[in-house]
């Protein structure tokens, strides 16, 4: 089994052993406390807590001796996908970005927002591989974060509890291995190749947690009560958008119909010049 950190204490010990300064370790601690609030109650289909995966991703990055800003970003890399900011909407907005900036600083936040915006699919991997040399420094760093994330997902075979993951590795694995090599991290490339090979040869795992969720999902305490405005306002907002879009389509169709009728009338014999 792998030796990467899965808890905050293990990560802090690793950072100290890897030579990160006390100031660096404090930055990571602050990000971890922020992550605890963002990802409370999140689990993977394997039953693994989401925060363990985040710590593992940061640990992979720390083992590569990257700047602490990248390690910190790795610890909250899914903020805009799965983070709960306490408001109506998730995702990237000026409000959520400001919260992340206040918690970890603008440089780390820039990594996180670029991570979320980077296209990531086996279909796009050949393009990324061919254009690595043309990427900016920060986008190369973000690409490395993406690779660290996918390695961590597979280290303990936890990815096998998710549907279609073998196909994902089969189609995208070779390109990811090549990307790590091209970025200048041969040890990461070799480890990814080894782990991906094991993933593809493993039999279905068990026992399985009793969930049908395909990806990260939320488990809340029984005492949890949903706030009305958080639950129903987004639904009302989506309904209003659907109604508005429907009205726009009807207006467009009606406008075309009226123009068509007017054109037909204008072309009828005897219409022009009639008094």
Task: Name these PLM-found stretches.
Residues 1-275:
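Active-site helical microenvironments for divalent-metal-assisted chemistry
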